[in-house]
Amino acid sequence: MKQEINPKDSPRGFAFELWKTAGMPKVTIFKTFDITRLIKVAKRSGMKTNMLMCWCIGKAASPIEEFYTLPAGGHLWQYDRLAVNTVVKTANGPVHLCDIPFSEDIHQFNEDYLRLTRQVRDTNEDHLLGDEYMAVDTSTLVECEIDGVASVYSELFTNPFLAWGRYRRGLFKTTLPISFQFHHAQMDGFEAARFLNGLQETVNGLTIR
C-alpha cells in the first residue's frame, strides 16, 4: 500500500530536499554483468531469459529499504511491495507496459510474467499495478548491442530504471551491459552499488528447483 511520509522523518530527508527541485535529479550507473549462469538456466528450464533477469532484479532490490520509497510530485511515498515492469511489444507494433508483482517464488513470478505479458499482447493495453506497488522499470532492446540508456527522466516517471540490449557471447562467458538509473532523492550511490552487486550475486546463484 502506498502512503505519503514526511521526508524529515525519513533517512532520505536531506537528499529529498537537496534533489526534489533539481533539473535532472536522476543518476545513471553502467555495469557489465556476467550472465553465463542465467543463460544456462534459461536453456535448461525453458524459462524466458527476460523473465529470469526481471526476477533477479526484483530479488536483488527486495532487501534494500530505499527501493520502497519513491519521490513523486514533490512528495515522498512509501510502499510495502515491489513489482518489476517490462515492456511488451504487441502484434500490431506499439509497445505497452506490464507490471509483474515480485514474488520470492520464481515459479509464481514466472506464472504471473507469462500470464500478464500475454494479457498485454492480447488486449493492447498496459497492465499497471498503480499505488499498490513500487515498480522497478526495465527496457530491453534486443535488436542491437548497447551499453545502456541515460537521461531518461520525466516528473511523471521517477521510478528506478534498468535498460539493456543484446547479450554478448564470449569464448568462456556471456556478458550483458546494463544501465541503472535512479532518482537521487530515493537513494545514493552506496545503495545503488549494493543493488548492482546484489544483482550479480543473484544471477550467479540462480537455480530452479
Q: What feature does the model see in each segment?
A:
Residues I5-K8, K20-L52, Y68-V84, V136-T138, ...:
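Gly/Ser/Thr-rich phosphate-binding loops and adjoining beta-strand/alpha-helix segments
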Residues L52-C54, G58-L70, L76, G93, ...:
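Active-site loop/lid in soluble adenylation, ligation, and acyl-transfer enzymes
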Residues T90-I146:
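Helical lid/core segments from catalytic subdomains that handle acyl or acyl-like groups
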Residues M1-F16, K20-M24, R37-V41, G58, ...:
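Domain-scale detector for complete catalytic domains at protein termini or as standalone homologs
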Residues L38-P63, L176-F195:
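Acyl activation and transfer enzymes in specialized metabolism, enriched
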Residues V149-S151:
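Core mixed alpha/beta domains of very large multi-subunit molecular machines
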Residues V27-F30, L38-R44, G93-H107, M187:
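Acyl-group handling in specialized metabolite and lipid biosynthesis
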Residues G130-E143, P160-N197:
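Histidine-centered acyl-transfer/condensation active-site motif
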